[in-house]
């Protein structure tokens, strides 16, 4: 499984839905920029390590939906 720009992430605990805005190469590893959207609130952006997001998907903390 590969995470690409445009993919959707869903976090069960906070009911956040996020869209992957970009995947950036960094000396410490890949960084994913996610724009989270909550109902009735302004969206906010976060930067997360690629490995952490993959681990959260594997452990069931995030639901991953590919863009295609």
PLM segments and residue spans:
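Short coil-to-beta transition motif at edge beta-strands of beta-rich domains
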Residues: 1-14
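Glycine-centered tight beta-turn/hairpin loop motif at sheet-sheet or coil-to-beta transitions
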Residues: 13-16, 39-41
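Short beta-strand-centered aromatic/proline hotspots
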Residues: 16-25
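Short acidic/glycine-enriched loop/turn segments that link adjacent beta-strands
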Residues: 27-30
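SH3/SH3-like beta-barrel fold
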Residues: 32-36
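Intrinsically disordered, low-complexity, charged/polar segments
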Residues: 39-68
């Amino acid at each position: 499984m590969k995470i690409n720009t445009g993919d959707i992430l869903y976090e069960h605990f906070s009911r956040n839905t996020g869209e992957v805005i970009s995947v950036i190469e960094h000396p410490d590893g890949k960084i994913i920029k996610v724009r989270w959207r909550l109902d009735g609130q302004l969206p906010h952006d976060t930067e997360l390590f690629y490995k952490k997001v993959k681990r959260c998907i594997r452990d069931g903390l995030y639901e991953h939906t590919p863009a295609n």
